[in-house]
Amino acid sequence: MRIALAGAGAFGEKHLDGLKNIDGVEIVSIISRKAEQAAEVAAKYGAKHSGTDLSEALARDDVDAVILCTPTQMHAEQAIACMNAGKHVQVEIPLADSWADAEAVMKKSQETGLVCMVGHTRRFNPSHQYIHNKIVAGELAIQQMDVQTYFFRRKNMNAKGEPRSWTDHLLWHHAAHTVDLFAYQAGKIVQANAVQGPIHPELGIAMDMSIQLKSETGAICTLSLSFNNDGPLGTFFRYICDNGTWIARYDDLVTGKEEPVDVSKVDVSMNGIELQDREFIAAIREGREPNSSVARVLDCYRVLGELEVQLEKQG
């Protein structure tokens, strides 16, 4: 499987590290905004080509599939371009920053029949897989998910502390993880409410947000998001269930009493991003729909679109 990766930033390298562990995968092309960065990352991971324009990679006959780790605002347009070029595509979360764009990607996926997968990593983290397996087996049901997504990002920096060329978003990026995961674990979302704090004068985004969700099963989700939190960074999920409580921190899982849970045997790796990439490659090879295909995550973007309308009305 011959791969091109666009967006050689902090998250792009996480994908490249995961892809190294998958048999038969070759990194052919690295595309990034800066030519020097693209060339440097290409050399590090053994890619024969680097450049600054996605169209260069899409024109290559030796590229089977593309992974997009580019700025949020480019995701939908680039995913469609990949499929128009006959390439399978995995687009990092979020699929789009509008409901209309998400629908457009879905339509193109249906037209082409190509694998179009979205990077909803929480579906693949061993911690969340552990809970999902118990739900599917009928061993527990979620009563409430309590989720905190906290960062300290008053300046436009990426995960490496480097300046970003684009602006992150609590609703369309960070909330997308939890909205999709809640539906994946507890059923279709039938009610959603949101409020947000003041808009940052320079970044032009809300720095604090609160979201409430309810699923068709009656489960509820309380999600707090902030770019103002000066403390432990990341997203932490508390699963309050009818048969126990668990806290998931990325790939790790503990009980509600902070007792470690062994999730090392849940899947072939403890790395959620690697597992996500393994699913992408396997779906292409096996000619099947992947977990977190655009079709399977689309409803998340319907909910985000509805929440955006609510927030706009609030002013």
Curated annotation (Swiss-Prot):
- Explain how this protein's activity depends on temperature: Optimum temperature is 25 degrees Celsius.
Q: What happens when the gene is disrupted?
A: Disruption of this gene prevents growth with vanillate. Only PCA is accumulated during the incubation of vanillate with the whole cells of the ligC insertion mutant. A repression of PCA 4,5-dioxygenase (LigAB) activity is also observed.
The yes or no answer to whether the keyword Oxidoreductase is present is: yes
The chemistry this enzyme catalyses reads: 4-carboxy-2-hydroxymuconate semialdehyde hemiacetal + NADP(+) = 2-oxo-2H-pyran-4,6-dicarboxylate + NADPH + H(+)
What InterPro entries does the record tag this protein with? Gfo/Idh/MocA-like_OxRdtase_N (IPR000683), Gfo/Idh/MocA_oxidrdct_glycsds (IPR050463), LigC_C (IPR045560), NAD(P)-bd_dom_sf (IPR036291)
Give the pathway: Secondary metabolite metabolism; lignin degradation
- Family (UniProt): Belongs to the Gfo/Idh/MocA family.
Function summary: Involved in the degradation of protocatechuate (PCA) via the PCA 4,5-cleavage pathway. Catalyzes the oxidation of the hemiacetal form of 4-carboxy-2-hydroxymuconate-6-semialdehyde (CHMS) to produce 2-pyrone-4,6-dicarboxylate (PDC). LigC has 10-times-higher affinity to NADP than to NAD.
Quaternary structure and partners: Homodimer.
Protein name, per record:
4-carboxy-2-hydroxymuconate-6-semialdehyde dehydrogenase
User: What does the organism's lineage look like at the top?
Assistant: Bacteria, Pseudomonadati, Pseudomonadota, Alphaproteobacteria, Sphingomonadales
Q: Which gene encodes it?
A: ligC
